[in-house]
Each structure stands twice: as structure tokens, then as C-alpha cells.
Amino acid sequence: MNVITETEYKEENINENTLVNIQEEYKKTKIQEVLNQLDKELIGLTPVKNRIKEIAALLLIDKLRIKLNLPQANPGLHMSFTGSPGTGKTTVATKMADILYLLGYIRKGHLLTVTRDDLVGQYIGHTAPKTKEVLKRAMGGVLFIDEAYYLYKPDNERDYGSEAIEILLQVMENQRNDLVVILAGYKDKMERFYQSNPGLSSRITNHVDFPDYTAEELLEIGIMMLEEQQYQLTEEGKKVLLEYIKRRMTQPHFANARSIRNAIDRARMRQANRIFNSSNRVLTKKDLVTIEAEDILKSSLFMDK
């Protein structure tokens, strides 16, 4: 049996006994570095991380098949990310763009995030130029369309979203070797969107569902957010923040990690106000970096109870 090195992938060197060191090939792609970053940046989401690893493994194997002159399945790369706001969809999309670039499936590796407003015009003849300009900027990378279902408004005959969808469909089919599209949004709304637009559904081969975070995971996220800004939460503060999270999860417009970031920002503001009002004493570094339980307890969520 002969082991093929990187410079020896020539047809005359390949036979059914050719060996490929998959770990060596995997290491050369540097994909593991991206996956490690994903683990570091996102708490939990194990099903999502496993799905991304599966997609990466399939793409790597397809690349090796090409090198060994085996038929390529021509994997569909367009994706659907479904889940509530604040569950890490944009972060994962960024890492997915990195993986696709490292494996050579896209030229540039950039991620362009857009919504309906970036694609759909307000009058006749306005939508096509807007959509085409966005697609031009996205070429060679990944186009991430958040809340994609807002492109389709069947109850409004004068809506131009369908025009944007038609242009998008053409590009997803005809230029799929130079652009990957990720459609994202709430799961139930995305399912209805696909039912109403079977052309889009047929072009999406990778579906990734993002579960909501647990209260404990959101506490970890909150602590991590504070540590990134060089703040510390007291032990009592951690207990209060967990209680805040449990209450906030039952309130309207809860957005997972996004809501926690907002809560952290407000706690920092209350901490600053508390410190300012006690400015008749000399402050220490510990004073400046410590978030106390009272900085969270002053939230209206506790005042109403």
C-alpha cells in the first residue's frame, strides 16, 4: 500500500490501496481551531456544535474524495438556522464561514448579515438593484439572512419581497459554488416560510436547530460576559442573577443571551451609580470591578414582586 502525501495527488499514484492520513489532513485545515473557538465563545448548545462538526466532517471527506479521483456528491451548502433570538445563530454562522473557507468551499470567508430591509425596496424597480447589490457584496462568502420569513408577505399584493426571493433562488442555484446562503429565524415561522416557498426549501440541505438556553447556562454566560469586561460577580450576586434569569425567562420578549447582556449592562450602570454616590471614600480596584447583589436586585423585575 502507498501513502499519498500532499504533493503526490496525481492520478497515476492513486489505486484502491492508496492510504490517506485523515488526521494529518484534518490538522492541515486548522478546522479544530475554529471548533475550539466555538466551544470557548458559546456555552452549551451541544446539539448545535455536534451538527457543525458533522457538516465539517462531511465536507472534509468530500475534499479527500476529490483528491483520490472519487465521485463528489457535490454537497449542498445552503443552510437553515432556526431558534429564538440570542441563541448564538450569528456566532455559529461566522464560524461556519471560517470552516468553509479553510476547506476551500468559498473564496473569501466573510459573513454578510442582512435583513428584509437590506433586500426589499419600497417601490417598483427598487428591489432588484438592492438585492443584487447585497448578493454582489456577499459573493465568495456567506450571506446570513436573519428573520428570512419577513421576505414573504402573501397578504400584501403590493409587497416586493417575492421579487427578492426569486433573485435569491436563481443565485442559490446558479452560483452555489461561489456563495453559501444561511436563512435564519424562529423555527415555526421558518417552517411556514419554507412551506410557502418550496423552491427555497429544496435548496436548503443543512438544517440546524438552536435550543433555548437553560437558566444555569445563561448564568454562565452572564458571568463570562462580566469577566470579559474584567468585572467580578459576588457569590450572592450569582444567586440573585440566577433568580433574575428565571423570572426574566417567563417575561415577554425574552431573547436568551441578548437579554442577559442587557441585564449585565444595567447592572454595571447601577454599580457605577452606587460607587459614585459613595465617592466620599477612597475607592479600590476591587470596588471598581465588583458587581454586588444589590446592583441586580434594583431591577424592576424584583421591584414588582
Curated annotation (Swiss-Prot):
Where is it chiefly localized? plastid
Entry's Gene Ontology molecular function annotations = ATP binding; ATP hydrolysis activity
SMART domains noted in UniProt: AAA
User: What do the Gene Ontology cellular component annotations say?
Assistant: chloroplast
Q: Give the signal peptide, or none.
A: none
> A Pfam family matched by this chain, by name?
AAA
What family does the Swiss-Prot or TrEMBL record give for this protein?
A: Belongs to the CbxX/CfxQ family.
Q: What does this protein do?
A: Necessary for the expression of RuBisCO.
- What is the name listed in the Swiss-Prot or TrEMBL entry for this protein? Protein CfxQ homolog
